[in-house]
A protein has these predicted regions:
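N-terminal charged helix/coil linker that caps or initiates catalytic domains
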Residues: 1-27
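Glycine-rich phosphate/adenylate-binding loop
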Residues: 2, 110-117, 122-131, 167, ...
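Conserved N-terminal Rossmann-fold NAD(P)-binding element of oxidoreductases
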Residues: 28-30, 53
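Hydrophobic/small residue at the entry helix of a nucleotide-binding pocket
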Residues: 34
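Conserved S-adenosyl-L-methionine
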Residues: 44-49
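Glycine-rich phosphate-binding loop and adjoining beta1-alpha1-beta2 segment
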Residues: 52-89
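Conserved SAM/SAH-binding loop
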Residues: 99-107
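Glycine-biased, low-complexity coil/linker segments
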Residues: 142-144, 160-162
Length: 270
């Protein structure tokens, strides 16, 4: 039954690319409105080795935008609810569910070097920066190797030996409604996104910069205001500075664009 699951993918990309897709290892941090759609798209296109990372459980307020969130999955760990769905698509896939949060304290729990692709769909500013810093082999440069933020923005820091995989990140998808404004840009060139601006400001303040450039999915639409009162959004609500409104068609575009970046990159290798 599963022999022809990816026939249409192979028709477009070819058998060599299909084999590469099957062999790649991907890890997604954050399974909200962006990460959950990214995961499904990757599995539907042939990724067979996928690790899902999120500490939260499905909440009723997730149902408007998160793929695995239904009235039947409320209260279930997000990683388990999504894993169940993905295995219904491809029962032979190797889907690892890790119900934990990525942070400075837990960073050593993840063997990033074993993955070909790392997808950042984290909401928390601090944890997001930590993932970028650690994955892209950052440390403060001292002495003659120290560079200014301006130089980093222009050229990025030199690539150091170490992890050779690819890193893709999602900027803010909340408070947007226009699907035609979604873009892909190098991190230091993202404009009009408050999250990216806050991340760059924090990196400059602490003199911690990515060792190489990476692509982000973002929106050029100016964030709209919240008009209502936010209800509790899972166990992570009170770790956020605030809870913003968001829509499935935007978060799904972000997630699927991240998946598209992975598939494009694999296809180029063929």
């Amino acid at each position: 039954m599963t022999d022809n699951l990816f026939n249409r993918t192979e028709l477009l990309l070819g058998s060599e690319a299909m084999e590469r897709i099957r062999s790649k290892r991907v890890i997604i941090f954050g399974l909200g409105g962006v990460g959950s759609w990214c995961a499904e798209c990757l599995v539907r296109e042939g990724i067979e080795h996928l690790t899902l990372v999120d500490s939260d459980v499905v909440c009723v307020t997730n149902c408007n935008r998160q793929l695995m969130a239904t009235t039947k999955t409320i209260g279930q760990p997000k990683v388990e609810a999504l894993r169940t769905r993905l295995l219904e698509i491809n029962p032979q896939a190797d889907i690892i569910a890790l119900q934990k949060n990525y942070s400075e304290e837990t960073a050593s729990d993840f063997s990033i070097e074993t993955y070909d692709y790392v997808i950042d769909a984290i909401d928390s500013l601090k944890d997001k920066i930590s993932l970028i810093i650690r994955t892209l082999s950052n440390s403060p440069l001292k002495g003659e190797n120290q560079r200014s933020a301006t130089e980093v923005e222009a050229n990025s820091l030199p690539l150091r030996e170490g992890w050779g995989g690819s890193f893709f990140s999602s900027m803010g998808a909340a408070l947007r409604i226009d699907p035609t404004k979604v873009r892909v840009s190098e991190f230091w060139k993202v404009k009009g996104d408050p999250l990216a601006a806050a991340m760059r400001s924090a990196m400059r303040k602490h003199k911690m910069f990515p060792a190489r450039k990476f692509l982000c999915v973002h929106s050029e639409e100016q964030p709209l205001p919240n008009l209502g009162t936010a209800l509790q959004d899972g166990s992570q609500t009170f770790n956020k500075t605030r809870t913003n409104g968001s829509l499935a068609h935007i978060t799904a575009i972000f997630g699927m664009t991240l998946a598209g970046l992975v598939i494009q990159d694999i296809n180029k290798q063929s």
